[in-house]
C-alpha cells in the first residue's frame, strides 16, 4: 500500500503538460487566449468561440468575482468558466438546429407578411413621417436575416455530414482472409485520397460562404439597431397626429418597436439567469445537459476505466498539520477494486468537489482523472459524458485511455 500527499486540486498538473504549470492553470483564466484554444480544438474552433465568448462567460465572471473567496476559489471559477463555455458552444448548436431554424424563419416570414399586408391596406394613408420607408426597411432586414440563417444552417449540415463520413471508415463484415481485409483497407484509403481534394474545395467554399453570411448578419444587426432608433424618433415626433392620419402604419410600427425591446430584454435576462445558475447551481445545469444532450464526450466504458476512490474522513484526534502544504489533513482517499490500493492524503482545502462546492463526506466515492484532479463520481461522470475533458484543466481523458489500449 502506497501513500501520497496531494497538495491541492489546483496544483496537480497533467502528465502531458508537466513542463509548464501555466498550461494546466492559467493565472488569468478570464482572459481569452486564442492560441491555446486553436491548439486544443482545431483550426476554426478558437475563432468561433472568440466571437461567442462575451455572453454567458461575462455573467459567470462577474458573479464569480462578486462571491467570497472561500466559496468560489480559483479552481471553482475555472470549472464554472468551462461550464459556461460548454453552454455557449451548445447554445450555438441549438440555435441552428432544425426546429429553431424553422421557427425563426416562420417568425420572420410572419413579420414580412404582416408588413406587406399593412403597406398594401394603408396605401391611401399619408403619414407625416416616412414610416412606410421604415416598415419596408424592417421587412428587408427580416428577409436578409432569413437568408443568412439558411446559409449558415446548410453549411453546418454539410460540415456535420462530412465529419460523419470521414470519422466512420468502412469495415469488413467478414475476416475470411488477410488479403481481402488488406484490399478493403487499400480501397478505403484510395477513396479517401480521391475525395480529399473535393472535401478541401468544398470546405474552402463553405468557409467563404460562411464568412460572407457572418459579415452580412453583423451588418444587418448593426443596421437594425440604427433603424430602430430612427423608427422610434419618427414615431415619437409624429405623436397623436400620426396616429390619427395613419393608424395602421402607426400601430404596426409601435408593435415592431415593442417586439424588438422585448427580445433584447428577454435575451439579457436569460443570460443573467443562466450565469447565476452556472455559478450557484452547476450540478443542476450538468444534469439538464446530461438528460437532453447527445453523447459527445466519453462513453460509459471510458468513464468506468478511470480510477475510483473512496474518501475516509479523519477524526479530530487523527488530524495533523502538514508543514510543507501549511494545511490540516482532512481525510484519505483510498483506491477501490484493487488488492494494493493507492492512498492520497487530502488537505482540508482540497477535500471538496469543485463542481458542486460540497465537502467530501465519509464514504463518498470519488473519481480521479488522469490529470490528477478528483471530483464526486456523480458530478464528474455526467460531465465526462457531455465533454471528455477535465472540467478544471481541460485535459482530454480519451487520450490517456487510447494510449493505455495501445500499450495493451
From Swiss-Prot:
It is a multi-pass membrane protein. A zinc finger (RING-type) spans 353-394. Keywords: Membrane, Metal-binding, Transferase, Transmembrane, Transmembrane helix, Ubl conjugation pathway, Zinc, Zinc-finger. The keyword Transferase applies. Residues 1-52, 160-195 are annotated as: Disordered. It is found in: Membrane. It comes from the Eukaryota. SUPFAM superfamilies: RING/U-box. It catalyses: S-ubiquitinyl-[E2 ubiquitin-conjugating enzyme]-L-cysteine + [acceptor protein]-L-lysine = [E2 ubiquitin-conjugating enzyme]-L-cysteine + N(6)-ubiquitinyl-[acceptor protein]-L-lysine. One of its GO terms (biological process) is protein ubiquitination. The RING-type zinc finger domain mediates binding to an E2 ubiquitin-conjugating enzyme. Mediates E2-dependent protein ubiquitination in vitro. GO terms for cellular component: membrane. It is an enzyme of class 2 (transferase). The lineage of its organism: Eukaryota, Viridiplantae, Streptophyta, Embryophyta, Tracheophyta. Pfam families: zf-RING_2. Its EC number is 2.3.2.27. PROSITE patterns: ZF_RING_2 (PS50089). This is E3 ubiquitin-protein ligase At1g12760. Pathway: Protein modification; protein ubiquitination. The chain crosses the membrane at residues 100-120, 133-153, 219-239, 254-274, 275-295. Its main location: membrane.
